[in-house]
UniProtKB/Swiss-Prot annotation:
CC per GO annotation: cytoplasm
Functional description taken from the UniProt entry: Nucleoside triphosphate pyrophosphatase. May have a dual role in cell division arrest and in preventing the incorporation of modified nucleotides into cellular nucleic acids.
GO BP, sorted A to Z: nucleotide metabolic process
Gene Ontology MF, one: nucleoside triphosphate diphosphatase activity
Protein's name in the database: Nucleoside triphosphate pyrophosphatase
Residue numbers annotated as active site: 77
Domain of life the protein comes from: Bacteria
Pfam name, any one: Maf
Length: 215
């Protein structure tokens, strides 16, 4: 009788709590969390979608080059944009406020670049996907903008807002994957894992081990 092949361990190339939570929703607990420290500065005239997929690939390939054992590396990068204008991952109150003002009353697009690399016997197999979601915020009052900024939940978030937090109350329209806006499109993630031989229906939880990239 043919034995079922054991799944390779999963490495998540991100310390994002949202991405960890999303993987947990589909019963995947990474064996390791290894944040990939890369330069995320957009290239000159780089558009949002190419930026997201490039950064996801760079994260995944960096971790693949650092590990010796066989594993599957999941990396993602999320970019919010109004038209061709890439919004920053806000780091200050003022950046959050500027982003929310720009999003108020209009549609924006959220792109997540997904890159999954299977490393086995020093051979790399790569799966890449760019996923787009359209989101529209209602017209926000100054009071709503100031209140949201006071929550600090938009700090370090693409476009200055946490879609699974209070900002969800601002959404009047959404088209596409909700998990994509949170940072990891689950439908595409499962499809990519399955294509690499990972059996998502027979996942054995593993103890989570937090690691950091070598500096």
């Amino acid at each position: 009788m043919k034995q079922n092949r054991k799944n390779l361990p999963i490495i998540l190339a991100s310390s994002s709590p949202a991405r960890i939570e999303l993987l947990n929703r589909i019963k995947i607990i990474p064996s390791q969390i290894i944040p990939a420290d890369i330069d995320e500065t957009p290239n000159l005239r780089e558009l949002p979608a190419p930026l997201a997929i490039r950064l996801a690939y760079e994260k995944a390939i960096k971790i693949a080059s650092q590990i010796e054992a066989s594993a599957i590396i999941i990396a993602a990068d999320t970019v919010a944009a109004v038209g061709r204008r890439i919004l920053p991952k806000a780091t200050t109150y003022e950046e959050v406020k500027n982003c929310i003002k720009m999003l108020s009353g209009r549609r924006h697009r959220v792109y997540t670049g997904l890159c999954i690399i299977k490393k086995e016997n020093d051979q790399l197999t790569v799966r890449q996907k760019i996923v787009q979601t359209i989101v529209k915020f209602k017209k926000l009052s100054d009071e709503e903008i100031n209140f949201y900024c006071s929550l600090d939940e938009g700090i370090d978030k693409a476009g200055g807002c946490k879609i699974s937090g209070y900002a969800e109350a601002f959404i009047s329209f959404i088209s596409g994957s909700y998990s994509n806006v949170m940072g990891l499109p689950l439908f595409e993630t499962v499809n990519a894992l399955t294509s690499l031989g990972f059996r998502c229906s027979s996942i054995m939880p593993a103890k989570m081990n937090y690691c950091h990239s070598a500096t």
